[in-house]
C-alpha cells in the first residue's frame, strides 16, 4: 500500500512539472481550456453516438398477398392525425445528428434504429422526405404547416432479413424502439439534435439555410416555432414521457402501449400529474392482417370496435387534443375535443387492412417445405393447439344497444345512447341491437393469467392501475385505462364524426362493421389464430421467447437472457438471431414484465401447462406445419388444410372506403392528389 501511495505522489509531481514546463501562465490557461474542450467534445461525441444495428440489404421481397402497390402505399403513408409534439416534417428531414453534419434521418441511420427503409425507395408524392415506412405527414389546420404523423404502419410492418434479402411483412410487428428513451436511440438522439440546433449558431445556420434561406424575418419565425417545439419536447420528457415511468426497458419491437396511452391521455392531456403511473409491462407490436375478423382485440381483449380503438391509439401516439384550459379545467363544448385526429385516414387504413392476407413462406429463400413433416405437424396442431388458437368461427353478434337516456343493456361503465343508436338497428327478441355485418367472426377465447401462466404484469396493470377521470365525469370514482377511455371516447368520437362530416347513415360503417363500442375487463389474455405467426418473432405477448422452437420446448430449455434488435432470421427455429450486436437490447426474463413462463408443453402438472411434452421430432413437425398453415398454395399437398385462409368469408364491401382515402389525401397532400391512386374494392 505504501508503494502505491508513493507511485501516486510521484505521478502528481510529474504532472505539476509538466504543467510548469508548458510555459508562462498566460499560455498554460488557454492550453488547459482547449484540452478540456477537446476532451469534452470527444466524450460527448461518444455519449451521443447513435445506437445503430448494422444491416446490409441487397433486395426486398414482399410476402403478403391481397394488396396492390397502391394499397400498400396507402397503408404506409396515410396519416391518422398523430404528432411528435409538433415536429414539422421538413424539420425532421433536415436535422443533423448531434455533433455532426450528417443527416439524422438518413436511410442508414433510420434502418439502424429499426425502422423500415427499402434501399431502392426514392422520394415520392406521399413520401417526399424519403423517410421510413410509417413516417407520414398531415397538414396543421391552423398554420398550414406539415407535421410528422406517426402512422399505423410504423409499428405494424415487420421485416425479416436473410443473407442480404429483406422479407417485408406487411401488417407484422416492427423492430423499432421509437418510445425508448435510452442513450443513442432515435428519440433521445432527436432531442439532442433539436437542442444543439437551437443553441449552436453554426448548426442553426445550416438548418435555417436549408429550410428558409437567408431572409431574417422568416428565420426569426422559424426559430420561434422551433423553440416552442423544443419546450414541448422538454415538458413531455419530464411528464408522460419521463424515463422513470418506464423502468422495464422496452427496447426494439416492444412498448407498453396501454400504459403509455393512459399516461398521455389521463396525465398529459388532462393536465393531471397525479395520474402518471409506472408502465412496466412492455408488449410486442401485434400483427394485424386478420384483426378485422376478431370479436375482441388487444392482448387482454378489452375492446371490440375499430374506430374507438384507433382514436384511443392516436391519442396515445401524441395526437394533440384540447381537453382542459390552462388552469386544468375541462373545456366547454365549443372547444372540447379540438384535435387533428383524422377520421377519414383511420377509416381508410382500417378498410385497406381487410384485404391483406398473411405472409407466405418463401421457399426460394428460406428453404423447401418437408411435406411429410408438415402433415405430421398438421395433426399435432389439431391435437395440441387448435382448442385455444382456433380459429373459432362464430355467427356474428347482435349487440344490444341503448336507444334512450338511462338505458345500458350491455352493463358498461359508460354509455352514449345517441352513439349506440346511430348505427344500423334491428330487433331481436324484442331487444334493439346492432347486427354485426360480418358473415362470420372469429371468437377469441380469454385464458386467465393463472391458467396460461405467462407473465401477468400487462393484464394486472390494466386491471388494477387506476386514473382520476373526475374532470370528465365530476364525482366519479377512479377507473382503469379501458373504462377511462370509454368515458372519453363516448364523448369524443361522435364529436369527430360531426367535424369530419360523417353522416348518420355512415356511422355504422365508420364505427367498423356496425359494431358498438364496448369494454371488457378481464385478468386474462386472448388466444388468437396463428396464420403467418412464423413471421412475427419474438413470441408471447411480451416478446420473452425468441423462437417458436423455444416456445415449444420445456421451460428449462428456453433462453433466460437474449439480445433483441438483430433482424437476421433463423428459418430452422423460426425466430430472430439472438447474439449480441450493436444496436441490440438485452432481454432478461428474470425481470417482472419480461418473464418467459407459461404456455408450457409438459407432462408435469404445473402452472401454465397447455399441452403434453413434445419430442424433438414433434417440435420440428409443428414448426414445418406452422410455416405453411392456412396457405392455400399448400392445401392440396397437405391433403386439405382446415385452416386454409381462402376458405374463410371475405370482408364486406365498404362503399365509403375509396372516398375516405381520397378526402384524407386531398386535405393533407393537396399538391399530389392528382398523382395518387387507390386499389380498393378489388
Give the ranges of each region predicted by the language model.
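N-terminal Lys/Arg-rich, disordered targeting/topogenic segments
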Residues: 1-25
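Periplasmic c-type cytochrome electron-transfer domains
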Residues: 15, 22-31, 37-682
Amino acid at each position: 500500500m505504501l508503494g502505491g501511495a508513493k507511485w501516486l505522489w510521484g505521478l502528481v509531481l510529474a504532472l505539476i512539472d509538466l504543467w510548469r514546463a508548458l510555459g508562462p501562465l498566460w499560455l498554460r490557461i488557454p492550453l488547459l481550456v482547449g484540452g478540456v474542450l477537446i476532451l469534452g467534445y470527444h466524450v460527448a461525441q461518444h455519449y451521443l453516438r447513435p445506437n445503430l444495428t448494422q444491416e446490409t440489404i441487397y433486395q426486398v421481397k414482399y410476402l403478403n398477398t391481397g394488396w396492390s402497390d397502391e394499397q400498400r402505399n396507402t397503408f404506409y403513408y396515410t396519416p391518422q392525425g398523430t404528432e411528435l409534439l409538433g415536429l414539422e416534417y421538413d424539420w425532421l428531414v433536415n436535422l443533423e445528428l448531434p455533433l455532426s453534419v450528417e443527416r439524422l434521418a438518413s436511410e442508414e441511420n433510420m434502418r439502424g434504429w429499426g425502422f423500415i427503409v427499402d434501399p431502392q425507395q426514392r422520394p415520392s408524392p406521399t413520401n417526399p422526405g424519403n423517410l421510413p415506412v410509417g413516417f407520414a405527414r398531415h397538414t396543421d389546420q391552423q398554420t398550414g404547416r406539415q407535421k410528422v404523423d406517426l402512422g399505423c404502419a410504423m409499428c405494424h410492418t415487420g421485416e425479416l432479413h436473410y443473407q442480404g434479402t429483406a422479407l417485408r411483412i406487411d401488417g407484422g410487428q416492427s423492430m423499432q424502439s421509437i418510445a425508448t428513451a435510452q442513450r443513442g436511440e432515435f428519440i433521445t438522439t432527436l432531442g439532442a439534435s433539436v437542442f444543439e440546433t437551437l443553441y449552436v449558431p453554426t448548426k442553426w445556420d445550416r438548418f435555417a439555410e436549408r429550410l428558409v434561406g437567408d431572409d431574417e424575418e422568416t428565420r426569426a419565425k422559424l426559430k420561434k416555432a422551433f423553440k416552442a417545439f423544443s419546450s414541448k419536447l422538454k415538458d413531455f420528457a419530464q411528464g408522460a414521457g419521463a424515463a422513470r415511468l418506464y423502468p422495464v426497458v422496452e427496447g426494439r419491437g416492444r412498448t407498453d402501449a396501454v400504459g403509455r396511452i393512459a399516461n398521455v391521455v389521463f396525465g398529459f392531456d388532462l393536465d393531471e400529474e397525479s395520474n402518471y403511473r409506472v408502465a412496466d409491462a412492455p408488449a410486442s407490436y401485434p400483427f394485424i392482417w386478420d384483426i378485422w375478423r376478431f370479436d375482441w382485440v388487444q392482448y387482454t381483449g378489452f375492446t371490440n370496435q375499430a374506430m374507438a380503438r384507433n382514436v384511443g391509439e392516436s391519442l396515445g401516439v401524441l395526437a394533440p387534443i384540447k381537453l382542459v384550459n390552462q388552469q386544468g379545467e375541462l373545456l366547454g363544448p365549443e372547444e372540447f375535443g379540438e384535435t387533428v385526429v383524422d377520421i377519414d385516414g383511420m377509416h381508410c387504413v382500417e378498410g385497406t387492412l381487410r384485404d391483406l392476407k398473411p405472409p407466405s413462406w418463401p421457399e426460394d429463400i428460406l428453404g423447401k417445405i418437408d411435406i411429410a413433416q408438415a402433415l405430421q405437424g398438421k395433426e399435432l396442431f389439431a391435437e395440441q393447439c387448435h382448442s385455444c388458437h382456433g380459429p373459432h368461427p362464430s355467427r356474428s353478434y347482435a349487440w344490444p344497444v341503448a336507444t334512450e337516456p338511462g338505458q345500458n343493456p350491455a352493463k358498461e361503465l359508460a354509455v352514449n345512447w345517441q352513439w349506440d343508436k346511430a348505427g344500423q338497428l334491428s330487433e331481436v327478441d324484442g331487444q334493439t341491437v346492432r347486427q354485426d355485418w360480418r358473415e362470420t367472426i372469429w371468437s377469441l377465447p380469454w385464458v386467465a393469467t393463472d391458467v396460461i401462466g405467462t407473465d401477468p404484469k400487462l393484464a394486472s396493470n390494466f386491471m388494477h392501475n387506476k386514473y382520476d377521470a373526475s374532470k370528465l365525469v365530476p364525482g366519479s370514482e377512479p377507473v382503469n385505462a379501458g373504462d377511462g377511455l370509454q368515458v372519453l371516447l363516448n364523448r369524443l368520437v361522435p364529436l369527430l364524426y360531426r367535424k369530419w362530416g360523417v353522416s348518420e347513415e355512415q356511422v355504422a360503417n365508420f364505427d367498423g362493421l356496425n359494431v358498438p363500442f364496448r369494454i371488457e375487463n378481464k385478468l386474462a389474455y386472448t388466444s388468437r389464430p396463428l396464420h403467418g405467426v412464423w413471421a412475427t418473432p419474438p413470441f408471447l405477448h411480451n416478446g420473452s421467447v425468441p423462437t417458436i422452437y423455444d416456445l415449444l420446448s420445456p421451460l428449462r430449455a428456453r433462453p433466460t437472457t437474449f439480445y433483441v434488435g438483430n433482424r437476421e432470421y433463423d428459418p430452422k427455429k423460426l425466430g430472430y438471431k439472438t447474439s449480441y450486436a450493436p444496436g441490440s437490447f438485452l432481454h432478461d426474463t428474470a425481470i417482472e414484465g419480461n418473464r418467459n413462463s407459461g404456455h408450457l408443453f409438459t407432462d408435469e402438472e404445473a402452472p401454465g401447462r397447455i399441452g403434453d411434452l413434445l419430442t424433438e421430432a414433434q417440435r420440428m413437425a409443428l414448426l414445418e406445419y406452422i410455416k405453411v398453415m392456412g396457405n392455400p398454395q399448400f392445401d392440396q399437398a397437405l391433403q386439405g388444410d382446415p385452416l386454409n385462409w381462402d376458405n374463410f368469408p371475405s370482408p364486406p364491401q365498404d362503399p365509403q372506403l375509396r372516398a375516405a382515402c381520397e378526402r384524407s389525401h386531398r386535405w393533407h397532400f393537396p399538391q399530389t392528389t392528382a398523382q395518387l391512386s387507390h386499389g380498393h374494392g378489388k
